[in-house]
Amino acid sequence: SLTFTSGNWNVAQTVTVTGVDDAVVDGSIAYTIVTAAAASVDPGYNGVNPADVSVSNTDNDAAGITVNPTSGLVTTEAGGTAQFTVVLTSQPTANVSIALSSSDLTEGTVAPASLTFTSGNWNVAQTVTVTGVNDFLDDGDIAYTIVTAAAASADPIYNGPNPADVSVSNTDNDVAGITVNPTSGLVTTEAGGPAQFTVVLTSQPTANVSIALSSSDLTEGTEAPSSLTFTSGNWNVAQTVTVT
């Protein structure tokens, strides 16, 4: 309020109007500084209503979705994880939902499956965790993507914007190999006493793997079976070979 006296009536008093940040993308908004009718025991001034003042508040908010980081994430086939965050750049007028998915579930999974931002938590970054998956293939490090779907909201400004996807690499931990156990110390007898060893692959093949078996001296011992076949379904199941 302002007070004028018989001593300062002719000295202009300054009123300062300060804009307020509403965090909403609403453009420049007009509002009014209302000057009420004057109150005074001087009947000449009592009730006189000065002009109101029109003001426009320039908006400084922009709708957007920030994903950080969007590249350089690394997971491992041993279950190693990586994380990124998502946050809005302005306050929405309705809930904003963003679905998340992995482009290759054999390399990595994402949690949670969706994010929801409200008018209360829009500026609080939400964390997304990406977990590597072991595919058992000796296929090297594989790149995949966490796909951020277009936002869905009853707020027209936030309905449809598509945030950046996130690039991830899953570090391979598989090595192609064949394990034979044991490789020495087996004993057979001329009375037909047998001995056994096992064979198994160390990673999943992309096609059948056949291994032929033979004895270096059929007058001393024979093997059964004479060949082994491993598939993508039984590669990690040890197969037994009997020597007689």
Describe each model-derived feature in a short phrase.
Residues A12-V41, G47-N49, V55, V86, ...:
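Contiguous beta-strand segments of beta-sheet-rich domains
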Residues A62, Q91-T93, L105, V175, ...:
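A generic structural motif
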Residues D21-V24, S28, G44, V48, ...:
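Intrinsically disordered, low-complexity repeat tracts enriched in Pro/Ser/Thr
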Residues T14, A78, F84, P92, ...:
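Intrinsic disorder/low-complexity segments enriched in polar/small residues
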Residues L2-N8, S54-T85, T89, P112-S119, ...:
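Beta-sheet-dominated interaction scaffolds and their linkers
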Residues S1, S102-P112, S215-S227:
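Short, solvent-exposed loop/linker segments at beta-strand-coil boundaries, enriched for Pro/Gly
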Residues N10, A63, N123, F136-L137, ...:
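Extracellular beta-strand scaffolds
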